[in-house]
Amino acid sequence: MDKRPNIILLMADQMRGDCLGIAGHPDVKTPFLDALAGEGVRYENAYSACPTCVPARATLYTGMSQEHTGRVGYEDLVPWDYPHTLAGELSKAGYYTQCVGKMHVHPLRNNLGFHDVRLHDGYLHAYRRPATPSYEDQRVADDYYWWLKQQLGVDADPVDTGLDCNSWVVRPWIYEEKYHPTNWVASECRDFLRRRDRSKPFFLMASFVRPHPPLDAPEYYLNLYKDESLAEPWRGDWNDCVRWERDVHSYHAQTAPSDESYIQQLRAGYYAAITHMDHQIGRLVSALVEEQIMDNTIILFVSDHGEMLGDHLMFQKAKPFQGSIRVPLFISGPERYIGKRGTVRTDLAELRDVMPTLLELAGAPIPETVDGTSLLHPVDREYLHGEHTLGEDSMHFILTKEDKYIWYSQTGRELYFNLRDDPHETKNVLEENPERVAELRTLLIDALKNREEGYTDGHTLLVGKTPVTVLQHTEVL
């Protein structure tokens, strides 16, 4: 029997890097994740360089930077055809590879190297349009939707809550908890463990859709937070109040709600979704204990990106600020694989590092296309170039463990934060630090030298160049 370790990738969607109890969050309750993190190695400086679902997942699945995946913004319906993927390489190495939950690739049933996928991508507008072929319609191609209709009737649909997939509105789940997609992911994972081929190691990706909206946790979890005095969002001296006043009444805007009670509801609903997911991860871990395989199983937990959650008058992701780009990341398992348990590392980690880390743990070769570095060793990354195309908010940033420089490509606006002294980005100290800003700006110019958008002439940053969401080379992979 193959003695290599089993590998589980636990993936949250839109979970902030600070939203773990073990990380010192004042409000959110994550007992099962805390237990796993406490028995592992936790990375305090883990980031998503292109912080929305599609580009972030492209990086995680391939180990490539956003420049090399070609995904520099959010764009559905673009084919995924990468020669080397995490699941594909583990499959070639002799692992049985199973995904349960969110993939967010195109076409929907692109297994991306997995032997099997039990799919639930959440609510995706692009796959519910009248022109969508029936086999690509989410209500047919998505396993959770298909299962829910079998259980509750053909009219059953998670959108019956009336909540949008990018809304800050909160409402309890309207069906029994066992029908919630978060429960479904855990249940399907438990069933996989029951029926797996025990003669070979497995790679299981348990990919939860929450705490990405809709914020529809079962009532029990909402009750944990709804009457609590929750910490308020962070505000800064640079916040865009004009933009906030313009957009604030749109329930799916990039801005946070204006009513303080709505902000508290938003945060309560978000934390409830996290705790609900945490408890279902507990269900999954209990199955590992029952199967007596915890002593040869490695668990890596991560999110694709974060959530602003009202900080700096903002909501959602695709922003260059800590709430949006910083993600939780830890590796839990036997010390013979991961090193000393209980360690907290400050290496500058990014989603591209997940693939080489898991391949090394499996004893599999790491393809030359991989840009990331295995987290099993010190990460020698002095800075990170991040970006996201989003209309007038299209931006780039240079991030170090100490500070951050931000440039908005359509307006030329610049921000600089000293993260060592101001981790919540409350003061823009651009004018006070001209030499350091010039150093970081030079790094950004260098990172953008060969970009098709023409963001730089090699000497300065050029404002107003047309941004794209998908670089041209992606179309010919």
Regions found by a protein language model. Give the residues of each.
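Short, charged, surface-exposed hinge/linker loops at domain edges
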Residues: E453-Q472
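Residues forming the ATP-binding cleft of Hanks-type serine/threonine protein kinase domains
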Residues: R420
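Extracellular C-type lectin-like domains
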Residues: F417
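A contiguous, mid-protein "functional segment" used to position or interact
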Residues: N433-G458
